[in-house]
UniProtKB/Swiss-Prot annotation, chain B:
Assigned GO CC terms: plasma membrane
Topology in membrane: Peripheral membrane protein
Gene name for this UniProt entry: pstB
Plastid is among the record's keywords: no
Function noted in UniProt: Part of the ABC transporter complex PstSACB involved in phosphate import. Responsible for energy coupling to the transport system.
Family: Belongs to the ABC transporter superfamily. Phosphate importer (TC 3.A.1.7) family.
Subcellular location: Cell membrane
PROSITE patterns membership: ABC_TRANSPORTER_1, ABC_TRANSPORTER_2, PSTB
CDD domains from the UniProt entry: ABC_PstB_phosphate_transporter (cd03260)
InterPro entries named in the record: AAA+_ATPase, ABC_transporter-like_ATP-bd, ABC_transporter-like_CS, P-loop_NTPase, PstB-like
Translocase as UniProt keyword: yes
SMART domains for this protein: AAA
Catalytic activity: phosphate(out) + ATP + H2O = ADP + 2 phosphate(in) + H(+)
Record protein name field: Phosphate import ATP-binding protein PstB
Length: 259, 251
């Protein structure tokens, strides 16, 4: 906890001098000096995280529902579960190489936000599936039996009773994934390119905030700008975590009584 | 009068383990039939055979016939969802959904496609009245069903079942998690409900069976040892094992 506070404090203190309103709304100028702001990278990040969740959430939650509620317990599904767990431990750069080979090259999406988002979705899929599975398994069996005994079909039981009951857990998983998407660099490095320009479409290349920090720190002399960007990133991530806590606590209250 | 439900030659297996052995038993229309017996004798399994809740367990297999109004509920072309609408169930642990009281009761009707708010209001009020819960919750219908006491939760679950207008209500030890006062209220409620519904109740509480039921079946390790009028089973049991059980010599 102390270490965490130290890291966050250090970055914010180092980043603060370089921070200003102008910094947020001007695009990076590029060059060795690392002049300019971070406007285009903020926009790219929003596109990237939004698109990633758009792809990730339906597939991930759908897969988890299938695995928990529908899939029979046989060799194939045990293999799928094993695969999901294994994929969760694969380094992100390997997903990056896979994304480069499939999305950038084979499917001709080139270095683009789309390629990056698809790759991130692959990277985070095991995380979201596991989180959703846990949330679904935590729903008492008696809810399922109760719903089925009232003449609900399996699908009605899932959509009207089980999913709502599991929603706080699932929401936490989704926000966790959003946080990971924000902070990811390695797999984006090889799928989004590093263009600092304002993205024109989802097929444009671009830099997310985290990637920008990496470029600033390794290819320019602008350590202060890197720190300022990192500070912005950290504030967003801390905010997201706060949101997660807020959501799960509110749901808890709503479910376990009270008004 | 023709029994509402007839069980004919039912054998039940979990994988290779036989849980019920050649059961023949009736559940008369608009009467309360109790199934008693020691733990693990198969009484819950027998109850769940009536609305095919055993189907949800893997490795479960049933032979024989369960006839609801002379129609075999295990025939391949029977609609299980429709069966469970006709044969409602109340569980051992009260299991309200994590939703408001209103939404709990309205759940069944909504699943049947009723969306008109006025109709739902009507059904919810009527069902809660029938379950003797209305007066306690009428001002708090938006409150979570889980905020109620155990006894209230169980009556909420009964209201939830009544809302789909079943013909039969199965109760699987509905009072075992409740205090004596709540238990008494549920038993009173059962007497009112039997005017309109056929009720089957599993209980390990023999006093409850003697007090509340019209017919009793005694199960022992998967065999139906004795079945008859509750008064006769408890005053003049024909089988020695029944007598031993109801006098508390084992179980």
């Amino acid at each position: 906890m102390l270490v965490l506070l130290l890291i966050i404090g250090y970055i914010i203190v180092r980043g603060l001098p370089g921070f200003s309103w102008d910094f947020l709304i001007t695009p990076p100028a590029g060059g060795l000096a690392g002049e300019g702001g971070i406007s285009s990278t903020i926009v790219t990040t929003l596109y990237l995280v939004g698109l990633t969740l758009l792809i990730l959430v339906p597939v991930g939650i759908g897969a988890a529902i299938y695995l928990v509620e529908y899939a029979p317990d046989n060799r194939l599904t045990r293999f799928i579960r094993y695969g999901v767990q294994t994929l969760a431990g694969v380094p992100s750069i390997l997903f990056g190489l896979f994304g480069f080979a499939l999305f950038v090259t084979a499917l001709h999406f080139r270095f683009s936000i789309l390629s990056g988002a698809l790759t991130l979705a692959c990277l985070l899929l095991p995380v979201l599936i596991t989180a959703t599975e846990e949330a679904l398994k935590a729903v008492p069996r008696s809810y399922r039996a109760g719903a089925m005994a009232l003449g609900a079909t399996k699908w009605q039981a899932v959509t009207h009773v089980i999913l709502p009951a599991a929603l706080p857990g699932i929401a936490t998983g989704v926000i966790l994934c959003a946080g990971r998407a924000l902070g990811e660099t390695a797999c984006l490095y090889v799928t989004m390119g590093g263009s600092a320009a304002m993205p024109e479409s989802l097929l444009s290349g671009g830099r997310s905030l985290a990637l920008h920090v990496f470029y600033l720190a390794t290819e320019t002399n602008a350590m202060d700008k890197a720190m300022a960007t990192a500070a912005v990133l950290i504030v967003i991530i801390v905010g997201l975590n706060g949101l997660t806590n807020f959501i799960s606590r509110r749901f808890q209250k709503r479910i376990c009584g009270g008004v | 009068m023709e029994p509402k439900i007839k069980i004919r030659g039912v054998n039940f297996f979990y994988h290779r383990h036989q849980v019920l052995k050649n059961i023949n038993m009736d559940f008369p229309d608009r009467q309360i039939t109790a199934i008693i017996g020691p733990s693990g004798c198969g009484k819950s399994t027998l109850l769940r055979a009536l609305n095919r809740m055993n189907d949800l367990v893997s490795g479960a297999r049933l032979e024989g016939e369960v006839l609801l109004d002379n129609e075999n509920v295990y025939s391949p072309n029977l609609d299980v969802v429709n069966l469970r609408k006709r044969v409602g169930m109340v569980f051992q642990q009260p299991n309200p959904f994590p939703k408001s009281i209103f939404d709990n009761v309205a759940f069944g009707p909504r699943m049947l496609g009723i969306t008109a708010q006025s109709r739902l209001n009507e059904i919810v009020e009527k069902s809660l009245h029938q379950a003797a819960l209305w007066d306690e919750v009428k001002d708090n219908l938006h409150k979570s069903g889980m905020a109620l006491s155990g006894g209230q939760q169980q009556r909420l679950c009964i209201a939830r079942v009544l809302a789909v207008e079943p013909e039969v209500i199965l109760m699987d030890e509905p009072c075992s998690a409740l205090d004596p006062v709540s238990t008494m209220r549920i038993e009173e409620l059962m007497q009112e409900l039997k005017q309109n519904y056929t009720i089957a109740i599993v209980t390990h509480n023999m006093q409850q069976a003697a007090r509340a039921s019209d017919w009793t079946g005694f199960l022992l390790t998967g065999d139906l040892i004795e079945y008859g009028r509750t008064g006769e089973i408890f005053s003049r049991p024909k089988d020695k094992r029944t007598e031993d059980y109801i006098t508390g010599r084992f179980g």
